[in-house]
């Protein structure tokens, strides 16, 4: 369920403050954050935000088409390595039904 429009978007106060300071100075530094639930505002465009995925910080370059999305959408938390399969040389998988 989406957030109520009367509440407005959630943006971490400290993160927004750092981005606005960098905009006023014209700097482009990587900003580390643990706030995956923060919504990307137009002020973030052109900056790189390192979003924590539970293990490390994943650098995310914010573009125009990312405005309105949440930071956590661009830092996956799960690493999918594929399903376990039999060895292809010996044909270790189960026989197929006809």
Swiss-Prot record:
Keyword DNA-binding: no
GO cellular component: cytoplasm; small ribosomal subunit
Example GO BP: translation
InterPro entries associated with the record: Ribosomal_uS19 (IPR002222), Ribosomal_uS19_bac-type (IPR005732), Ribosomal_uS19_CS (IPR020934), Ribosomal_uS19_SF (IPR023575)
Coiled-coil blocks: none
Molecular-function GO term, any one: structural constituent of ribosome
UniProt keyword terms in alphabetical order: Ribonucleoprotein, Ribosomal protein, RNA-binding, rRNA-binding
Region (Disordered) location: 74-98
PROSITE patterns cross-referenced by the UniProt entry: RIBOSOMAL_S19 (PS00323)
Secretion signal span: none
Superkingdom of the source species: Bacteria
Gene3D superfamilies for the chain: 30s Ribosomal Protein S19, Chain A (3.30.860.10)
Similarity comment text for this entry: Belongs to the universal ribosomal protein uS19 family.
Entries under PANTHER family matching the protein: RIBOSOMAL PROTEIN S19P FAMILY MEMBER, SMALL RIBOSOMAL SUBUNIT PROTEIN US19M
Job of this protein: Protein S19 forms a complex with S13 that binds strongly to the 16S ribosomal RNA.
Protein name: Small ribosomal subunit protein uS19
């Amino acid at each position: 369920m989406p957030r109520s429009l009367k509440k407005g978007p959630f943006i971490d106060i400290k993160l927004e403050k750092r981005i606005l300071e960098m905009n006023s100075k014209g700097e482009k530094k990587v900003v580390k954050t643990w706030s995956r639930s923060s919504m990307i505002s137009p002020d973030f465009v052109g900056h790189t935000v390192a979003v924590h995925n539970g293990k490390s910080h994943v650098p995310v370059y914010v573009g125009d088409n990312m405005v309105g999305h949440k930071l956590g959408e661009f830092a996956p938390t799960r690493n999918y390595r594929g399903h376990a399969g039999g060895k292809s040389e010996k044909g270790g998988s189960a026989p197929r039904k006809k």
